[in-house]
Structure formats: structure tokens, C-alpha cells
Amino acid sequence: VSKEFAAYLTEYGREEKIPIKYTDLLDWQESIPVYDKDGVDTLWRSVIYPPHQQDEIFSALTEIYGLMKTGGNMEVIGHLTVAQIDFCQFGNTNPFRVKIRNLSNDVHDYFYVKKADASRVFGLEVEHILSPNRIFYIIDADTIIEEHIMGIPCDQFVESHLQRSEYQEVSLAKEFIKFNER
């Protein structure tokens, strides 16, 4: 990330100090594969940290979630906990997916911890500017935190939704046009 782009990110509140970095999460002790509901390997591995590191890691990740969702008001995150951390061994970013669980109502949410690079950050910023919806991310040196955006993974969408009626094809084309015009 160039100095100019870093200054832009700082000015618009995208650059912020976070309590844990991507490289800190790489030191897991064990991992087990994550399968989908049909028993197919998702290429994600649920990672397990040594007990002496786990509490510190979970606390830092919960704090990051609080930064994302409450603007830093840490008084409201006491009922949140990390339920699971998954590592994706496929793709160019090898992200960590963090599942946060609300102990009060058992609702969960996700966010991602990835290696930062200028093209990824630039792409997120352009998407944020062009999209009608706010896209939340934080960058700190070589780490980027991205919110989870609800939807269907592309490969599942292609397999299960594109083989449908002509009406849906027209509807899908209209959605792409709307997105392109934004």
C-alpha cells in the first residue's frame, strides 16, 4: 500500500490498530476439515489453538468484532464469544473465517482476517464507494479485517440456481445491470 493510499485510508477511518494480526493466527496446533451438509469437503479447516494462546486470541478477535459492529464501544461485547475459527487452504488469500456467537440469543455472525495487499484493499474501497450498502473493513499493516457479506457462494449458486427458468435468467441479468450502473 503506497503512502498516498495509506493516507487516504487513515483519513476515511479504514486504517486502525487491531489487537491481533493475520500472522498471529497461523500458529494453530491442530485442524480438522469442515464439511457441508452433504458431507463434501469445503476446503476450510477448523483450527484449534494451544490452551495458553486460545483465550488471548479469542479476546482479541471479539474486540475486533466490537470495533466493527459498535464503533469501539467495548461495553456491549461481554455476551459475545468466538465459536469457531476456520482457515481456508484454497485460494490466494488463505483467509481465516471467525464465527462470533451471541451468548444471549445464540445468533452468530462471521468476519474474515486476511493478508492485506493493495489490490484487495483498493477493490474493497471501490466496492464500498459504488455499492448502495456500506462495506466494512479495517486495515492494519499487513492484516485486513472484512465483514461477512450474506449470500450464496458462487460455486453453489452456479450449481443450484443457474439451471432454472428463463425468467430467472432475465432477472439475474437485470441484477447484474443494476450493479454495473451503481
Report residues per predicted region.
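An acidic, glycine-rich, mixed-charge low-complexity segment common to nucleic-acid enzymes
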Residues: 1-51
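Conserved ATP-binding subdomain of kinase catalytic cores across diverse folds
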Residues: 23, 29-32, 40, 45, ...
